[in-house]
């Protein structure tokens, strides 16, 4: 069981990447117990993904944070914890990294405040983009109040929304 904890999925590999080159790139983060590049059974050609297993789970986490999105053999790779598959990836990991955490926090109040008071009401495109823009569940958590407010105000007049917007923008 312990060996599975330090196991990383590495996707987006070049077909030229082999176990040796993958180990070389990841070995600077710690002791590696196993490297596998998954190959097609018939052609023996790389299928573009593999696994790197570290002896130590902390080394694996360091490698995952450092190498995700980096270029190996000319291809940008995706590194994730193996076995936690898409469920974990879409919620926590991609949600946190897609928008960049710093931009996320700093930009939320000011950026959303201005767009709420400005063109956001004029055309609904922004609202939908922000919901499906790869920011994960946390964005919905913050904007759920304004989301439902936005939809109900459209049909019932915007008095609450207008006062809220002017408060939000003047408050900065």
UniProtKB/Swiss-Prot annotation:
Domain RRM: 6-84
Compositional bias of kind Gly residues: 93-106, 114-125
GO BP: mRNA stabilization; positive regulation of mRNA splicing, via spliceosome; positive regulation of translation; response to cold; response to UV; stress granule assembly
Tissues where the protein occurs: Ubiquitous.
SMART domains: RRM, RRM_1
UniProt xrefs under Pfam families: RRM_1
Chief localization: nucleus
Subcellular localization: Nucleus, Nucleoplasm; Cytoplasm
UniProt region (Disordered), positions on chain: 69-172
Keywords: Activator, Cytoplasm, Nucleus, Phosphoprotein, Repressor, RNA-binding, Stress response
Domain of life: Eukaryota
UniProt PTM: Methylated on arginine residues. Methylation of the RGG motifs is a prerequisite for recruitment into SGs. Phosphorylated by CK2, GSK3A and GSK3B. Phosphorylation by GSK3B increases RNA-binding activity to the TXN 3'-UTR transcript upon exposure to UV radiation.
Gene Ontology CC annotation, any one: nucleus
SUPFAM superfamilies referenced in this protein's UniProt entry, alphabetically: RNA-binding domain, RBD
Induction, per UniProt: By cold stress in response to DNA damage induced by UV irradiation or UV mimetic agents. Up-regulated by hypoxia.
GO MF terms held by the record: mRNA 3'-UTR binding; RNA binding; small ribosomal subunit rRNA binding; translation repressor activity
Modified residues (Phosphoserine): 130, 138, 146, 156, 159, 163
Record PANTHER family: TRANSFORMER-2 SEX-DETERMINING PROTEIN-RELATED
Annotated domain remarks: Both the RRM domain and the arginine, glycine (RGG) rich domain are necessary for binding to the TXN 3'-untranslated region. Both the RRM domain and the arginine, glycine (RGG) rich domain (RGG repeats) are necessary for optimal recruitment into SGs upon cellular stress. The C-terminal domain containing RGG repeats is necessary for translational repression.
Assembly and oligomerization: Interacts with EIF4G1. Associates with ribosomes.
Biological function: Cold-inducible mRNA binding protein that plays a protective role in the genotoxic stress response by stabilizing transcripts of genes involved in cell survival. Acts as a translational activator. Seems to play an essential role in cold-induced suppression of cell proliferation. Binds specifically to the 3'-untranslated regions (3'-UTRs) of stress-responsive transcripts RPA2 and TXN. Acts as a translational repressor. Promotes assembly of stress granules (SGs), when overexpressed.
Name of the protein described by the UniProt record: Cold-inducible RNA-binding protein
Organism of provenance: Homo sapiens (Human)
Primary gene name: CIRBP
